[in-house]
Curated annotation (Swiss-Prot):
Monomer. It is an enzyme of class 2 (transferase). Its EC number is 2.1.1.228. It is found in: Mitochondrion matrix; Nucleus; Cytoplasm. InterPro entries: MeTrfase_TRM5/TYW2, SAM-dependent_MTases_sf, TRM5-TYW2-like_MTfase, TRM5/TYW2-like_N, tRNA_Gua_MeTrfase_euk. GO terms for biological process: tRNA N1-guanine methylation. This is tRNA (guanine(37)-N(1))-methyltransferase. The keyword Thylakoid does not apply. The lineage of its organism: Eukaryota, Amoebozoa, Evosea, Archamoebae, Mastigamoebida.
Amino acid sequence: MEKEQLPELKYINVNDFNINEKVIGIPVQTNEVAKYMKMFKGLCYNRIKTKCVIPYNSERMILLETPLKEQTQKLIQDNHLKTVETEVPLTIKNFNVNEIMKRYINKNIQLPSSFETVGTLAHMNLKEEQMEFKYIIGEAFLIKNYPRIQTVITKTAEISNEFRTFPLEVIAGIPNTEVTVICHGVKFVLDYAQCYWNTRLETEHIRIINQMKAGEILCDAFAGVGPFAIPAALKGVKVYANDLNPTAVKYMRINAVNNKTTIECDNMDARDYLRKIVLEKHIQPNYILMNLPATAIEFLDCIPELYLQHCMIHCYGFSPLPNAEDLKKKAFELLKGEYPITIREVRDVAPKKVMYCLSIFIESTKHLTSGNNVPEAKKTLN
């Protein structure tokens, strides 16, 4: 099978790295290679995708880290070993990503060291001083990670819209932001430029889904492309899912089909959606998910007008306070009462910004609803 062709590079010239590197080696007999490799452990030539033992005449030569360290010189002298200067032909594959970047970037610029992987896409958060060299950085990471990574992007501004997406730029590779991600055996397709996705929440998705049983009903008010909804449906949960982002809903429907499961999807405001599910369709969910940490807590204000029974609400939010006491207070204000609540830290997002999950058990909201609004509820599947 032919190796996949690296996408066209515009800023890095791979020929810049076609050099012969001068290295010092010690000729040894073939049957003594193991002995001297042990003696010079940690002192041998160690460039990536090269060998430190090469043929030499009819014997072998052990290549050493050059220039020679003081310890290496002493071992050579004490063991009366001969040294030979040779050259190792190198290409760009023999250089690590930092070495490639340093070839073009001012040494005073801090180099990026990591990225988030989403399918075949690498998401980098470059700092302001790195943006001048963004295309060099992107191509360097592409070269060293291709074909596992085929597109490199960087965020160009913070999240500022209701869909939780952010402005981004493709800085290397194929200009395509549609990716396929597999999480715990479930395949998701999404356009990363137009849909929210966070790989770091994979464990949280599974933790919540593990609480559910086949035959129960889930109402996911901010479902995105379906990271909660699809695995829940595969478990036998009846899933009603909604998102305000029409592109996310499009991909959620695609993901349901691809995973051979069924979800009832809507594209509307979350408050209107919850009213539709409970008050108009007379559906009683066992679980309501509200995963929009920036504003989800505000949507609890519609819960009192619904007729809910034995419903667990998982609502996510950000707080700078230990135990998210501010979120708890706000939740009870909007719910017009105090309910059993468990607050759990999900992850640190930034200094003094922690993501929490508020799990609120609603025994009944009947006392808060007018008689005209109380529907005949369906709690489990027929």
